[in-house]
């Protein structure tokens, strides 16, 4: 089957310059956005910088929380061939400093995926819905009217300049997107408070071993030698492991390849292991964008900070963000206007679904840049981690008195850190409550943002961390 047949591109489409919608990036968010728009009968093209053979090959930890549900535009059944390990059901947190391992239950459905296979399946799903793909196409600039409305992009394909005009542009180009560098977004609510230091630098290898690992039912985490970083070992199968590590870019740079190699060499289960694939990436371990809309323009997935800032997980959030953005884009096209007011509902749905929770979790990412890693690991090893994890996953802000007393008894010697964590959780809860009152229109945005910034000052004061934003 040819590439054009595989993605439904007719020869005439390669020279076409006018579309209802242009989506930049064939990742999870971009493909779900395009599939949703195409399902509604609109002409949509996905511009992808990679070749047809490389598209979908993305650096990822491969772990997926929330594997039980995906938006209808690309159903879970189409993605399931990429789910290589659905037997994972808990986290395993290794603390070498304390010679301790915490087995932490994780509610909900987990899976580890083959990310390249998953990427191809998502692309197939968007193509099946009617989206057109233009591969080997790199965006160079964003087209805007005098009033700032985005009307398309300029790109280059194999040395040939291309113009794409559209009613709506969806930015699914990933972390530190070039579209946001090129577009003038100053006169809208679109979040431009974005710097590299809010991101995590990560690297992963796909490693094969001869004997099954003992922890094939777990997602394994291990702290790096400095704060604000961790190693992971996520089993695709009993003998195929996604091994990687990352660190927050506020910290002194790590030698990612060498540090991972050192840890692999010190683990008996990886003796004689063979490396199949290597990739690195920047991950937006930050709060979601305050607003990801601008007239004629919406950002989705990594391009809008739709990632859990404590784990780096972003597949499920990207799928829903792409869907929500597309549904709002469809409404805007039906109304004949792509103003911020019409697109705003997309922001609300993101915050309601996962954005508020991610913003609160970002408080703990901020704390990790200021806390002494050995002190924190000592506390975690002393605390009844399994029970505390279960209580926190349940969504309860209050632990039972029995658990509180047990925790305090086991945390002797770490009371300063316990108090810091307690106060930090109060700040996170306050922030969560504020995000749950996200404004229903741009009119209330400035007031909401000012109060959020005030709450963040309290976060920095409590944690002792340098300002992240």
Show which residues each predicted segment covers.
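Core beta-strand elements of the Rossmann-like FAD/NAD(P) dinucleotide-binding domain
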Residues: 15-19, 158-168, 293-296
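Beta1/beta-strand and adjacent pyrophosphate-binding region of the FAD-binding site
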Residues: 10-29, 45
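Glycine-rich FAD pyrophosphate-binding loop
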Residues: 22-26, 35-58
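Active-site-proximal substrate-binding core of FAD-dependent oxidoreductases
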Residues: 324-377
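Predominantly flavin-linked oxidoreductase catalytic cores and closely associated redox partners
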Residues: 26, 127-268
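Short beta-strand to alpha-helix junction loop
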Residues: 105-124, 248-256
């Amino acid at each position: 089957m040819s590439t054009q047949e595989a993605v439904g591109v007719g020869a005439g489409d390669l020279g076409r310059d006018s579309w209802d919608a242009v989506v930049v990036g064939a990742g999870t968010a971009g493909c779900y956005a395009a599939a949703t728009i195409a399902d509604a009968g609109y002409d949509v093209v996905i511009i992808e910088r990679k070749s047809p053979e490389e598209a979908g090959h993305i650096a990822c930890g491969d772990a997926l929380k929330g594997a039980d549900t995906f938006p209808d535009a690309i159903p879970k059944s189409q993605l399931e061939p990429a789910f290589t390990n659905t037997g994972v059901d808990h986290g395993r947190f290794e603390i070498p400093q304390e010679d301790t391992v915490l087995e932490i239950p994780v509610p909900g459905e987990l899976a580890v995926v083959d990310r390249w296979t998953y990427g191809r399946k998502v692309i197939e799903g968007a193509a099946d819905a009617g989206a057109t793909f233009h591969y080997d196409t790199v965006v160079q600039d964003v087209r805007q009217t005098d009033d700032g409305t985005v009307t398309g992009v300029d790109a280059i394909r194999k040395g040939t300049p291309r113009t794409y005009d559209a009613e709506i542009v969806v930015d699914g180009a990933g972390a530190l997107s070039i579209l946001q560098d090129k577009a003038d977004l100053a006169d809208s609510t679109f979040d431009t408070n974005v710097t590299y230091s809010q991101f995590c630098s990560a690297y992963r290898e796909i490693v094969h071993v001869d004997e099954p690992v003992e922890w094939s039912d777990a997602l394994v985490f291990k702290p790096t030698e400095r704060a604000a970083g961790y190693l992971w070992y996520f089993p695709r199968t009993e003998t195929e492991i996604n091994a990687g590590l990352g660190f927050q870019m506020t910290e002194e740079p790590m030698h990612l390849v060498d540090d991972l190699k050192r840890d692999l060499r010190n683990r008996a289960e990886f003796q004689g292991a063979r490396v199949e694939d290597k990739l690195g990436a920047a991950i937006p371990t930050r709060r979601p964008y305050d607003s990801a809309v601008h007239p004629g323009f919406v950002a989705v997935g990594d391009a809008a900070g739709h990632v859990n800032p404590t784990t780096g997980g972003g597949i499920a959030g990207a799928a829903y963000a792409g869907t929500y953005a597309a549904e709002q884009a469809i409404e805007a096209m039906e109304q004949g206007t792509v103003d911020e007011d019409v697109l705003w509902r997309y922001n609300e749905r993101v915050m309601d679904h996962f954005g508020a929770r991610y913003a609160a979790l970002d408080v703990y990412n901020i704390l990790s840049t200021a806390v002494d890693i050995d002190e924190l690991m000592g506390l975690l090893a002393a605390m009844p981690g399994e029970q505390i994890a279960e209580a926190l996953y349940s969504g309860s802000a209050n632990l039972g008195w029995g658990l509180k007393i047990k925790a305090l008894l086991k945390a002797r010697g770490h009371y300063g850190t316990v108090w810091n964590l307690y106060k930090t959780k109060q700040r996170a809860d306050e922030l969560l409550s504020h995000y749950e009152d996200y404004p229903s229109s741009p009119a209330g945005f400035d007031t909401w943002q000012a109060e959020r910034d005030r709450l963040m000052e309290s976060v920095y004061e409590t944690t002792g961390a340098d300002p992240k934003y």
